[in-house]
């Protein structure tokens, strides 16, 4: 079993290294995809991701584990794959034009650093038209962000970047984790849940 692992915006594959280690320890081969939102455009990045997946897994069984923007890239690429993943696991995925992206989109420094892909996260039409995975998928949402009077999210459960309700997709199960957005991939419970799901054969994975 292969795992294609995709990091989030402004990060590198290094941010997913602990999760990758835990999966490898369980006997899962890991392949980490790298991209840079500051220097890449959406079309080129999704094309590279599709080619990366096809090259790394060939006809072998595989899953996708993606953090944040990585899940958006994954959803865009899935329909074009001739060999589909057996399952997808999304960590803190933005599934709509989230409040944080909409607030940051007009700012010059954000446009400069986050590039085209950062702007797309703030567009309702773009986010609502992304394909919903047809294969078994699970979402992990963090709720360790500040709530209450001094929180930009008010009383809404959040991970410091996304509100939990901004990570949901119809018909896809979600597991809440006491994690912040930036570090949710280091949550051992999530890694073990992915491993247990695969090993248990729940999704009929080999």
Go through the PLM ranges and name each one:
Residues 2-9, 14, 18, 22-36, ...:
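Serine-dependent carboxylesterase/thioesterase catalytic core
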Residues 133-206:
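C-terminal catalytic-base region of ester-bond hydrolases, centering on the histidine
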